[in-house]
Design a protein with these regions (language model features):
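Basic, nucleic-acid-binding surfaces and adjacent catalytic neighborhoods in DNA/RNA-processing proteins
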Residues: 1-123
Length: 123
């Protein structure tokens, strides 16, 4: 929920929040005060990496290499932009679990409940 708080980090849109948490393997309900140091470090790194990747790739957070690994070609790279965001009811690229859409603080958030297992990640 911290990433949803504009006083913590301003300017993160819904898609960046979903993607940062996905790449950090954190659930949006995880409390920052209860995260391990390595989880906090990873979260900090992912905020920078995912934001920069989205900027460089014109809003895409799906890495080009991961896309090529999944699909073998680049023809549809423009159509598939994210790992979790706006992919509700579609399989997770990592584990195959169905991506879920939830509402938190009046904002939509997308997550894989298997990859982002609340409170149980030991990154």
């Amino acid at each position: 929920a911290t990433l949803l708080d504009q006083s913590f980090i301003a300017g993160l849109g819904n898609y960046l929040r979903s993607e940062i948490l996905f790449f950090s393997k954190l659930h949006y309900r995880d409390k920052p005060a209860l995260l391990k140091n390595n989880q906090l470090t990873n979260l900090s790194n992912q905020i920078k990496k995912v934001s920069l990747r989205a900027y460089v790739q014109k809003g895409r957070t799906l890495k080009y290499d991961k896309f090529k690994e999944l699909y073998g070609n680049i023809e549809n790279f423009r159509k598939i932009r994210h790992m979790a965001f706006a992919r509700s009811r579609k399989p997770c690229f990592h584990c195959g679990q169905i991506i879920q859409r939830e509402i938190s603080a009046s904002r939509r958030i997308y997550l894989c409940i298997k990859c982002q297992n609340q409170g149980k990640q030991a990154i």
